[in-house]
Amino acid sequence: MKKLLIILIVALSLNGFAQQKELVWHTDLNKAINISVKTEKPLFFFFTGSDWCGWCKRLVKEVFVKPEFATWAAKNVVLVELDFPRRTPISEDLKKQNRELGQMFGVRGYPTVWFVTPQVTAGKVNFNKLGSQGYVAGGPKAWTAGANKILKTK
């Protein structure tokens, strides 16, 4: 009986791990736009300095790696990481894409998250800015509360 109980507990535990949402961070803007258009979810542009920005690392540690955030993100947005690393090499195309988007959205500090909806017309993309936010203390609940206020404008 004890053996059966242990097997049941292990099976239920593994099932819980399998159901946890796995975050998918896109770096290919065109792919993310296509997903956003198909799912009718806004884009979540995360402007970060992943290997040097302390506040970016803190936001990731306190919010983005938490199961509550993963569940919220899967339901509400298409995640796009726009990284500006100093020590980690990235392709020239990715550097150019990230730099152009940073200029387009007037990013002056990190971390910055922009919520936008893409509008594709005749092969051209325009972004409708919904709003932005940076680091918010209080974990996933506080951060997603601010994000939800922005998303209500869509």
Model-identified regions with their sequence ranges:
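Sec-dependent N-terminal signal peptides
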Residues: 4-13
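Sec/Tat signal peptide C-region and signal peptidase I cleavage site
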Residues: 14-20
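A short beta-strand-turn-helix
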Residues: 25-43, 73
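Short active-site neighborhood of thiol/selenol oxidoreductases, capturing the structured segment around
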Residues: 39-53
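Typically the conserved alpha-helix immediately C-terminal to a functionally engaged Cys/Sec
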Residues: 55-74
